[in-house]
């Protein structure tokens, strides 16, 4: 599998080492990974994610999203190898709208980062699955937690998503 185009573009945000691939081959579930991803890429923008997805689509390469690796579902396993997209560098709170009590964030923002950012506004993000999961990861798993009875799951907290396919 020739991934040199991505390696050239992403440079130090592109990894193929066994150590990095191994870190991205599992989550907190009981599932044992049988394969490693062929590469792990760390995009910073939606356009970069789109570039990775386009490359993978053109070359028939599986893509695996990776937030913080705290999920219990086993969905981050690279069953057929492929490219793991780690969203940790997509960690910006883009906008907070006090009047509407909503905000826009990138997928890699964690719940603790968001609540730290919101602390002085009087707002908070109520979904608490126990782990310091990323917002993107929580959306992908339908996260819930200790505040679900009062505030609902992630499903009730999300107004919209930008999805790149």
Each predicted region: which residue ranges?
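N-terminal accessory segments
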Residues: 1-31, 58-62
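N-terminal glycine-rich flavin-associated loop
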Residues: 6, 31-63, 87-129, 143-165
């Amino acid at each position: 599998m020739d991934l040199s185009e991505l390696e050239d573009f992403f440079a130090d945000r592109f990894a193929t080492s066994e150590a990095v691939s191994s870190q991205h081959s599992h989550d907190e579930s009981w599932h044992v990974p049988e394969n490693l991803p062929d590469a792990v890429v760390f995009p910073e923008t939606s356009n970069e994610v789109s570039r990775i997805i386009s490359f993978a689509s053109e070359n028939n390469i599986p893509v695996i999203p990776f937030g913080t690796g705290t999920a219990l579902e086993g969905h981050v396993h690279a069953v057929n190898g492929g490219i793991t997209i780690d969203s940790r560098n997509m960690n910006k709170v883009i906008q907070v709208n006090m009047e509407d009590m909503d905000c826009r964030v990138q997928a890699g923002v964690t719940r603790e980062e968001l609540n730290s950012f919101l602390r002085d506004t009087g707002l908070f993000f109520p979904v608490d699955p126990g782990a310091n999961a990323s917002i993107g990861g929580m959306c992908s798993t339908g996260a819930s937690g200790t505040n679900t009875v009062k505030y609902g799951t992630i499903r009730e907290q999300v107004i919209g998503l930008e999805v790149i396919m």
